[in-house]
């Protein structure tokens, strides 16, 4: 293969305030599961930089769970589709697909022999279904709740018991198979968010929005006690997870804490305070082997440290909203990837290890649309919050003084030499020097969309929605129209100069990439055809002979300058999502980002 996937830096879980997030464990103890958008993410628990992404759902995926055998995963989405797929092959072949009810699936449970599945959620006619995994034949009827069911679990030892937790403040207890309703447990005074049997099946825990955790006998359903007396947490409890030996319980709450409970002593052994911001609310947890994980409303996954509750062992960060732009900094022999997302977050990633963090302080408040680096260790970004920001790559801290307010919304930014920056806004081109606006062109007869600056000559190329590239030159503190336009094949979406400044590549809405030769007075060198939909982004390889383009057709092409017919086609680089930005780490490594909030690296080999 001329290309192969080298690394995946996965997205964080997609979070919603007041809604529990299920982190599902792996019976073999190696991985954990969660969902974001239409994707199911499988991450290695020892090294979270190792990730695999399943993207076959047509609607937003909500929950995924391993079968106890470890060979299959069942995942459910907002439309009520349940897909059961293989975990042993990279292709993740579909085994079975069912539609237990029409509506969002909120939780899934398997019997220990991996033969029966219970599915619960927000159905229209019914809220739950339990059936054989291979035929879909019913193995009972789940009744006893009159509102949306949030959680389900099946005792992993015989005789089987099934329990559900619902918005009607009740848990329903069923025996089977075939599963039949026995009684309701109505101890909670608010919604029941989570129900879980202990690994040996002897105990059952239920957690609710009333801040209480009740323990029951796993076989009979008799109430044993209320953990912590009247209240286990000051806020609603969204998840509980048992220790492997069943003696302790981990709970996650909206009061921004997680707790470890000694079940026999009925007391909290450890309390983890995870912050004071609303984004620090804890909406999910998982206890797997020696690892204790919790997930915050921000999407961050915390590895909790029993020996030091005040500070997590590590926090997995990243994006959980679509990534809009990216740039790469190669210095000191290391590559750092900078990414900006739809919610205003900017992250920096070590390209080798995947270690990443976000800039500190108060930054952009809306989508980061474009970014570029200057030679002074600064990242220049423009955003839909109508600002342009200069952020130090050394301090990695936003500073209020480094923000420049624009008159109208900026779309794209380019950095030249000598402290010059050009940004194109709606109906306006602005020149900045040393972090100050020095010149603007307002009376344009076209709508500017993209900009690039020739580092050597200072020529500014502005791509317009009129299907032309307009050339300007920086003269002192002003921009002079050169009176020259270059014809693209459609409305320009992106443009980039090669690193040696010899060529200008232009992508357009008519699916074409056009390359102009700078030395020959910007004469057209070649046109490159292949995209089936609007081309979006273009990036030059450091060898100046190859360049990559991405489009709305979800394709990435790597083109050869001297031969338009020699191309490498990369379909489904980010399946179901178009690639929003590209950048080369070196001559053979291409990085891509997309609306799936993931960063991928590809090894590209040329003949």
From Swiss-Prot:
SMART domains in the cross-refs: WD40
Iron in keyword set: no
Principal location: membrane
Name of a matching Pfam family: WD40
A single cellular component GO annotation: cytoplasm
Subcellular location: Cell membrane; Cytoplasm, Cytoskeleton; Nucleus
Keywords of the record: Actin-binding, Cell membrane, Cytoplasm, Cytoskeleton, Membrane, Nucleus, Repeat, WD repeat
GO molecular function: actin binding; actin filament binding
Keyword Nucleotide-binding among UniProt keywords: no
Any single GO BP term: actin filament depolymerization
WD repeats, residue ranges: 4-45, 48-87, 93-135, 138-176, 180-218, 224-263, 270-306, 311-351, 358-408, 432-474, 480-518, 523-561, 566-604
PROSITE patterns referenced in this protein's UniProt entry, alphabetically: WD_REPEATS_1, WD_REPEATS_2, WD_REPEATS_REGION
Family to which this protein belongs: Belongs to the WD repeat AIP1 family.
Task of the protein: Induces disassembly of actin filaments in conjunction with ADF/cofilin family proteins. Doesn't sever actin filaments alone, but caps the barbed ends of filaments severed by cofilin, which blocks annealing and depolymerization and allows more extensive severing by cofilin.
Stored PANTHER family: WD REPEAT-CONTAINING PROTEIN 1, WD-REPEATCONTAINING PROTEIN WDR1
Annotated protein name in UniProt: WD repeat-containing protein 1-A
Source organism (scientific name): Xenopus laevis
């Amino acid at each position: 293969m001329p290309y192969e996937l080298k690394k995946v830096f996965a997205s964080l879980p997609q979070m919603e305030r007041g809604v529990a997030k299920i982190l599902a464990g792996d019976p073999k103890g190696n991985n954990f599961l969660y969902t974001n958008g239409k994707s199911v993410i499988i991450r290695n628990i020892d090294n979270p930089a190792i990730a695999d992404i399943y993207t076959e759902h047509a609607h937003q995926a909500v929950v995924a769970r391993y079968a106890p055998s470890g060979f299959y995963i069942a995942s459910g989405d907002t439309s009520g589709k349940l897909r059961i797929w293989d975990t042993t092959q990279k292709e993740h072949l579909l085994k079975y697909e069912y539609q237990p009810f029409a509506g969002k699936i909120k939780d899934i449970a398997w019997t220990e022999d991996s033969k029966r599945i219970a599915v619960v959620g927000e159905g229209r006619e019914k809220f739950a279904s339990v059936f054989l995994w291979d035929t879909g034949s019913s193995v009972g009827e789940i009744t006893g709740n009159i509102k949306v069911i949030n959680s389900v679990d099946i005792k992993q030892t015989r005789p089987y018991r099934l329990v559900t937790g619902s918005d009607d403040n009740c848990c329903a207890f069923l025996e089977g198979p075939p599963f039949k309703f026995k009684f309701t447990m109505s101890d909670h005074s608010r919604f029941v968010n989570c129900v879980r049997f202990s690994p040996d099946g002897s105990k059952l825990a239920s957690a609710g929005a009333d801040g209480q955790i009740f323990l029951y006998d796993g076989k009979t359903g008799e109430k044993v006690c209320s953990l912590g007396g009247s209240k286990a947490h000051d806020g609603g409890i969204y998840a509980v997870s048992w220790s492997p030996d069943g003696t302790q319980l981990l709970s996650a709450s909206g009061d921004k804490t997680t707790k470890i409970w000694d079940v026999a002593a009925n007391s909290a052994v450890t309390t983890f305070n995870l912050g004071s911001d609303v984004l620090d609310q804890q909406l999910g947890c998982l206890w797997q082997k020696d690892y204790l994980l919790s997930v915050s409303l921000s999407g961050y996954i915390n590895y909790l440290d029993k020996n030091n509750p005040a500070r997590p062992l590590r926090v997995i960060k990243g994006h959980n909203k679509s990534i809009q732009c990216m740039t790469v900094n190669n210095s000191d022999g290391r590559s750092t990837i900078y990414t900006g997302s739809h919610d205003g977050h900017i992250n920096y990633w070590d390209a080798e290890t995947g270690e990443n963090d976000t800039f500190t302080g108060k930054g952009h408040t809306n989508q980061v649309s474009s970014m570029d680096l200057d030679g002074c260790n600064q990242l220049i970004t423009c955003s839909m919050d109508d600002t342009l920001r200069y952020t130090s790559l050394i301090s990695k801290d936003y500073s209020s003084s480094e923000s420049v307010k624009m008159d109208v919304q900026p779309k794209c930014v380019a950095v030249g030499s000598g402290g010059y920056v050009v940004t194109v806004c709606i109906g306006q081109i602005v020149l900045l020097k040393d972090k100050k606006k020095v010149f603007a062109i307002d009376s344009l007869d076209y709508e500017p969309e993209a900009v690039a600056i020739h580092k050597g000559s200072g020529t500014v190329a502005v791509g317009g929605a009129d299907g032309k590239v307009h050339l300007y030159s920086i003269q002192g503190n002003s921009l002079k129209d050169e009176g020259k336009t270059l014809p693209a094949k459609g409305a320009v979406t992106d443009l980039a100069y090669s690193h040696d400044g010899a060529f200008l590549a232009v992508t357009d809405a008519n699916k074409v990439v056009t390359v102009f030769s700078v030395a020959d007075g910007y004469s057209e060198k070649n046109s490159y055809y292949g995209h089936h939909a609007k081309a979006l982004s273009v990036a030059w390889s450091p060898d100046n002979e190859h360049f990559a383009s991405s489009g709305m057709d979800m394709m990435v092409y790597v083109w050869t300058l001297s031969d338009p017919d020699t191309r490498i086609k990369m379909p489904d680089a980010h399946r179901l999502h178009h690639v929003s930005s590209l950048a080369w780490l070196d001559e053979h490594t291409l990085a891509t980002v997309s609306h799936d909030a993931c960063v991928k690296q590809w090894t590209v080999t040329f003949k």
